[in-house]
Amino acid sequence: MANLKLLLVGIGNPGPKYAYNRHNIGFVILDSLLNSSSASYQTNSKYSLARTDEEGVTIFYLKPLEFMNLSGKAVAEIAKKNGISPENILVIHDEIDFEFGKLKLKEGGGHAGHNGLRNIVEKLGTNTFFRLRFGVGKPSTASEVSDYVLSNFFPEEKEKIPELVQVSLQKIYDWVRERKNEFQKPSDI
């Protein structure tokens, strides 16, 4: 029987300057997820990639290392190279349309102006992948969006990040379990 292959993608911007920005919450969550496993990243100039294999499930953990708006190149490359279909991809990203701390797992949909998602949709040629949307709040005017997502969390928000990361991890574990159950379901012939 074939293994189920899943791709978990945390998107953000590379480098210490951006490490704790709102835009990098995808990296923070993916790193926490990987820390709870025995795997570690292998890094090249384009991405950091880790892999776990257990109970018939291969999970790839991907952090694209080009800027956010070029995230799709690494996602498409890893998906294609490993035969991973879009419905087995989960992208973890910041969401300005949600108040801080709101989390939502969603399949498909538009990019809502998020340049990282826009590029992933473009490079995969579809929007049918899953997303874990992490609410980071919204600035008062649209012209402030870029500065806002590239700013660090407020101290009172930073305090809540560890708990919200744990909730995010549970949502990811649940998604992996659902994908596994779907994969193992006998097909109707």
Curated annotation (Swiss-Prot):
Primary localization class, coarse: cytoplasm
PROSITE patterns attached to this UniProt entry: PEPT_TRNA_HYDROL_1, PEPT_TRNA_HYDROL_2
Keyword RNA-binding: yes
An annotated GO BP: rescue of stalled ribosome
Coiled-coil residue windows: none
Binding locations of tRNA: 18, 67, 69, 115
GO molecular-function terms, A-Z: peptidyl-tRNA hydrolase activity; tRNA binding
Site feature Discriminates between blocked and unblocked aminoacyl-tRNA, where: 13
Enzyme superclass (EC): hydrolase
CDD domains: PTH
Positions annotated as active site in the UniProt record: 23 (proton acceptor)
Record's GO cellular component terms: cytoplasm
Enzyme Commission designation: 3.1.1.29
InterPro entries: Pept_tRNA_hydro, Pept_tRNA_hydro_CS, Pept_tRNA_hydro_sf
Catalytic activity: an N-acyl-L-alpha-aminoacyl-tRNA + H2O = an N-acyl-L-amino acid + a tRNA + H(+)
Keyword entries, A-Z: Cytoplasm, Hydrolase, RNA-binding, tRNA-binding
Residues of the site described as Stabilizes the basic form of H active site to accept a proton: 94
Protease recorded as keyword: no
Subcellular location: Cytoplasm
PANTHER family assigned: PEPTIDYL-TRNA HYDROLASE
Quaternary structure annotation from Swiss-Prot or TrEMBL: Monomer.
Family: Belongs to the PTH family.
Function description: Hydrolyzes ribosome-free peptidyl-tRNAs (with 1 or more amino acids incorporated), which drop off the ribosome during protein synthesis, or as a result of ribosome stalling. Catalyzes the release of premature peptidyl moieties from peptidyl-tRNA molecules trapped in stalled 50S ribosomal subunits, and thus maintains levels of free tRNAs and 50S ribosomes.
Name of the protein described by the UniProt record: Peptidyl-tRNA hydrolase
Origin species: Leptospira borgpetersenii serovar Hardjo-bovis (strain JB197)
Phylogenetic placement of the source organism: Bacteria, Pseudomonadati, Spirochaetota, Spirochaetia, Leptospirales
